């Protein structure tokens, strides 16, 4: 364990602040947010942001424009630009399209589902190889 003064001092050195942009107002104010001293990175939540624009998916021109705007603000202020992505393919796509550089990939539920699906397919392959 650490003494409280030591813990507090350590937390000052190791704590980071990531601004989370998940609604249209955040997009409107992203220049100020990204320029704020003490903000270490910008995270965009495209699913929530799409809902904020009244959309049910992530393909709208409004969302595309918002992701570009947030990316420009992050780059202008030398802040990492980050988001949740379902997989490495989407990370590569968004890196190129929007300049995202930090990715939170999938979720434990998605990994378990993919792993279980893969293992089930392997079992089915064994069965079909030895059945006539």
Region locations from a protein language model:
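Expand to "…catalyze enediolate/carbanion chemistry for C-C bond making/breaking, isomerization
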Residues: 1-132
